[in-house]
Amino acid sequence: MVSRCSCLGVQCLLLSLLLLAAWEVGSGQLHYSVYEEARHGTFVGRIAQDLGLELAELVQRLFRVASKRHGDLLEVNLQNGILFVNSRIDREELCGRSVECSIHLEVIVDRPLQVFHVDVEVKDINDNPPRFSVTEQKLSIPESRLLDSRFPLEGASDADVGENALLTYKLSPNEYFVLDIINKKDKDKFPVLVLRKLLDREENPQLKLLLTATDGGKPEFTGSVSLLILVLDANDNAPIFDRPVYEVKMYENQVNQTLVIRLNASDSDEGINKEMMYSFSSLVPPTIRRKFWINERTGEIKVNDAIDFEDSNTYEIHVDVTDKGNPPMVGHCTVLVELLDENDNSPEVIVTSLSLPVKEDAQVGTVIALISVSDHDSGANGQVTCSLTPHVPFKLVSTYKNYYSLVLDSALDRERVSAYELVVTARDGGSPPLWATASVSVEVADVNDNAPAFAQSEYTVFVKENNPPGCHIFTVSAWDADAQENALVSYSLVERRLGERSLSSYVSVHAESGKVYALQPLDHEELELLQFQVSARDGGVPPLGSNLTLQVFVLDENDNAPALLASPAGSAGGAVSELVLRSVVAGHVVAKVRAVDADSGYNAWLSYELQSAAVGARIPFRVGLYTGEISTTRALDETDSPRQRLLVLVKDHGEPSLTATATVLVSLVEGSQAPKASSRASVGVAPEVALVDVNVYLIIAICAVSSLLVLTLLLYTALRCSAAPTEGACGPVKPTLVCSSAVGSWSYSQQRRQRVCSGEGLPKADLMAFSPSLPPCPMVDVDGEDQSIGGDHSRKPRQPNPDWRYSASLRAGMHSSVHLEEAGILRAGPGGPDQQWPTVSSATPEPEAGEVSPPVGAGVNSNSWTFKYGPGNPKQSGPGELPDKFIIPGSPAIISIRQEPTNSQIDKSDFITFGKKEETKKKKKKKKGNKTQEKKEKGNSTTDNSDQ
C-alpha cells in the first residue's frame, strides 16, 4: 500500500514538472538556479540547447546576454552554449533580506531578431552567523515587578534567508527568568524574558545571563550576547500605551515635519514617577531614525527625511516610554507605518537592437527595433502603455510584458519620404498620468524601383548640312527619382541600320552627359531626316531604362552650283549652235538654256542673265529671267552680225549664290540659206523654220514612223498600268500619275529620286491628292510620256474640290513662293497666300521689263505653282485658276497641269530633268511662206513640261 502511494506521488510530481516546463516554453522564459558564492565557471544550464538554437549559428546570429544591473555575473560560452558563473555572486549583496532572489537575463539573437527571457534563481547558503548589535544588554528591573512580567530583548539578525535565517534562542540556566519567543509579522522572532521568581535586590542586586541564537543552516552557526540585569528599588507602576501596536497609513513623498502619529501613554504612579519621556527603542535601526524623529515630551512622531515607496513601503518603529521614577519604569509599543504609492516616477523607455536602415521594399511586418518600458511605481501607477507617432507606416506590437516590437505596417517609398523620426511615448496609468518619450530615427534605404524619365518622349532637331565632324547637335537629359547608384543615368544609342550603314556611323551620344554628336558631315541631298532612339539606363540591379525618339532634320545649304544640261545642239557645258532666220520678228524664241541645281528651295531657284561677249555691243537678244529662253528683242536687220556669241549666266538664290555659264552661238541666215545651213547645223534648229521643197514621200515616211511610235508608247503605257507596283522597305518609290481633266492634263514624272527612311515601317511614296470632282485617270509609269484623255472634258472647266488639303508632312520646313510671269500677284490673306494664275501661255511675247517667272532650275515654269510649308491651308483657286503644275516639297516630283488647245504642240525639248537626261524629240512642221509662219508663231505656244 505504501509502495503504491509512493508511485502515485512520483507520477504527480513528474506531471507537475512537465506542466511547468510546458508553461515555461509557452511563455518564452527559462528558469535556472545557482547557489551563491559559486566558483567561476560553475555550470548553470545549457541555454542554447534549451532555447532550441544551433551551436553553429550562435556567432552568426550575434548571440548575446544582457542584464540591466548584473550583466557580468553570468556569461555564455558561445562554443558549447553553456551558461556559467562569471564572477562572485553574493546573495545578500544582490537581494538583501528578500526571500526571492533572481537574476533576470535577456538573450538576444539577430537574423531574425529574437529575444528570450531567462531567470536565474540565486539560492542561499548558510554563510552568515547570527549577530547581535551589542555584546552586552543591560536591563534595569525593579524588584517590585510581578511574576510573569515580560522584558523584551534585542534579538539577533542573520543575513541569510529561509532556513538559514530561522533563529532559535537559548537562555543560560537560572532560577529567575525563562525565555519566551514572539513571532513578528515578517516571520522574524525576538526573545522576551519572563519573570518566574520575584526579585530581591538585597539578595541579588544583579544577574548575569547568556542569550545564544542558533540559525537553521547546515552546518549551524551561533551568536550570543551577555545580559546584565540590574535589580532596582521599587517604582511599582510602569507607563502603559493605549495599545501595544499602532498602524498608520500615509502617502509617500511627505514633506519634513509632517506628523505621523501622536502616542499616548499613562502611569499610575504619582509625582516624579508619573512623568514620562518617549524615545525610540534600541531596536530601531539607524535608517528609520534618519527618516523619523520623536518628540520625547509629547510623543509625536514626525517625518524627518524623504520617504519613498520605491525604497521601502513599510516601517516598523519600536517606541519606549520611561517614567522618572527611581528606578524608572519603561513601557513599550510598536508603530507600523505603511506608505501608499504615488505616481511620482515617469516611465523609462529603452530602444535596443535597431535593424537600420530599412529597405523601401521591406515586407510588411518586418521588425525594425525592440522597445522595453518600465516604471518604478506599483499598481496602476506602474502599468505602462506605449504609443507611436501617428500617420507613419509603422506600429508597435506587444510581444511580452513591457516589451514591444516596432514593425513595418505599410509599404515604404523612399522617393516620397526618405527618413522617419518616430517618437515612442510611454504613459503610465496614474492620475495624472506621467509619460516619457524616446526618438527612433528610421532611414529608408533606396531600391531601384524608378526608371529614368525624359521630359518629352520625342524631340525634333534642325541641323544644317555640311556640319563639322563631331558637331554637338543636341543634349538629352533624363531624371531618375532613385538615389545614389540607382540614379546614375547613362545614355546610349538604340542601334539599327540605315540602308547599308549603321546608325552609329552617323551619330553618337555621350554616356554621361547625354550630348548627341554628328560623327560626320550630313548631306541634305543624301539624307533629309535622321530618326533614331536614345536609351537611358540607370545603375541599379537590375537596371531600368526608357527611350527617347530624336528626329534630326538636315537643312539644306547652298553647296551645289547650277549644272548645265546637255541639249541636242551641243554637249553639256559646251557651246550651243543655233540658226536663226533674219526674217524673225521680235519675241521669237531662238534657244533655251537648261540647268539644274541639286539643292532645294531657294538654293535651287535658278535665274538667267545674258552677258555681252563684246563690250558695248548691241545684242538683239534677251533671256528669260527664270525660263532660260533666249528670244529676239526686235526684228533682225542687215546691221546685225551674222554670228552672235551669247554668254548666259545661270545663278541660284542661295547665300552666297553659285553660278554657271552657258555659251550659245547664234548664226543669222537668210531664208534661201536655211536648207544648206540646216544640213550643217545641229538638230537644235527652232521648229518654226519652214522646210521648203520637202519630198512628199519624206512626209509620208515621217508620219508612218510617228504613228508607229505613238502605238508603241500606248502599248507600253497599258502594260505598265496593268503591272502592280512593288515597294520595299526603305527602297525607292515611283509615284506615278497622269490625269486628264477639264483644264488639261496632269503629268507626274520622276528623275531624281530621294527618300527619307526612318527605319520604322515601309517608305512612304510621294503623296498626291486630287479633287474627287475630276474624272478618273489612268496610271502610267514615271518614265513614260505624258498622256491626256480627250473628249468633252477638255472643253468644260470645273471648280476644284475645296476638300483638297495639304498633307501634314508638307507643312514642316522650308517654303517657296508662287512666281507668276507677267501678271503674277502674291497676296496675303487670312488663310495664307492667294495665288492668281496667269491666262497667258509661255508663247506670249514677253515685255521688255524684267520677268517674274519661277525658278526653272527648281523645276517650275512660268505657269506653275508650288506648295507652301506653313501652318495654314492655302486658299483654293477659283474656276479657271487651277495651276498648271505644282511641286511636292522634299521630293523631286513635279505635277504638271496644263490646259492645251486642241491644235497645240508639245515641245519635247522643253522637258527638264534633275540628274538624268531625258530624250528630247522635236517635231518639225513644214509651212510655206514667211507670212504663214509668222501667223502660226502668234497663234501657237510651246508648252514646257517639267520633270524632276
Swiss-Prot record:
Its main location: membrane. Residues 732-892 are annotated as: 6 X 4 AA repeats of P-X-X-P. The keyword Thylakoid does not apply. PROSITE patterns: CADHERIN_1 (PS00232), CADHERIN_2 (PS50268). Residues 907-921 have a biased composition (Basic and acidic residues). Glycans are attached at N256, N264, N547. SUPFAM superfamilies: Cadherin-like. It is found in: Cell membrane. Residues 1-28 form the signal peptide. One of its GO terms (molecular function) is calcium ion binding. Residues 29-132, 133-241, 242-349, 350-454, 455-564, 587-689 form the Cadherin domain. InterPro entries: Cadherin-like_dom, Cadherin-like_sf, Cadherin_CBD, Cadherin_CS, Cadherin_N, Protocadherin/Cadherin-CA. This is Protocadherin alpha-10. It comes from Homo sapiens (Human).
